[in-house]
A protein has these predicted regions:
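N-terminally biased helix-coil "hinge/interface" segments that flank
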Residues: 1-213
Length: 213
């Protein structure tokens, strides 16, 4: 695959980037803290939708994020004290997640997800399962709203791309995003949750030297 849209979905955000002809696209507009980086960096666009993103009703409108439950307490279904309805809770109630992960070692609390989602369902005049479906749909819309302008700036048609998904939620939401964008091929690497760390270990080092003249 030579033309790839990457999608790294974590707990707080979804980061997208683009490879054309096997080469990562770069950007000259990056900052570390408040300081501009005066050299090309990998062009990454962050979208405020992740597995821990909290659902809320704002003036009658369903919104996902940017607030996040984080890794602790995390989604309500993790049974770590979280009570806010998150996108992960929506995945569980909508049937995208099983009720146990890690070979059954990590149980997900469906009842806690239903309890957390109840205020959202009430605000939407729906049951918790319908509310969960709407949460997933809004998250997809947020992603599409971020991805399409990014690809337009690069002059790329989504239908010409393969979607590479990783991160904790990439394998769940990647196919949904691909369907919205008209992308026909989705790749999920082995161990997607640790794919970034793996890349950091095996990538070749490169050096850029710049001098002001």
């Amino acid at each position: 695959e030579r033309n790839i849209l990457t999608m790294d979905m974590g707990g707080t955000s979804t980061d997208i980037s683009l490879l054309r002809d096997g080469q990562a696209m770069t950007s000259n507009a990056a900052e570390v803290g408040d300081f501009p980086v005066v050299m090309p960096v990998t062009g990454i666009e962050a979208i405020g939708a992740g597995g821990g993103s909290i659902a809320m009703i704002d003036d009658g409108v369903l919104r996902i994020g940017p607030q996040s439950a984080g890794s602790y307490p995390g989604p309500a279904c993790f049974s770590r004290g979280g009570t806010a309805p998150t996108l992960t809770d929506a995945y569980l109630l909508a049937g995208y997640l099983p009720e146990a992960l890690l070979g059954g070692k990590m149980k997900l609390d469906r009842t806690a997800s239903e309890r957390a989602m109840a205020p959202i369902a009430s605000g939407l005049k729906s049951d918790v399962f319908g509310a969960a479906d709407m949460c997933v749909a809004v998250a997809s819309s947020n992603m599409v709203a971020g991805v399409l302008p990014y690809l337009a700036r690069q002059g790329v048609d989504p239908e010409d791309l393969t979607l590479l998904v990783y991160g904790g939620g990439g394998g769940i939401h990647g196919p949904l995003l691909a369907a919205e964008l008209g992308i026909n091929r989705v790749l999920v690497p082995t161990s997607p949750s640790t794919f970034c760390a793996f890349g950091g270990l095996v990538s070749e080092l490169s050096h850029d030297v710049m001098e002001t003249v």
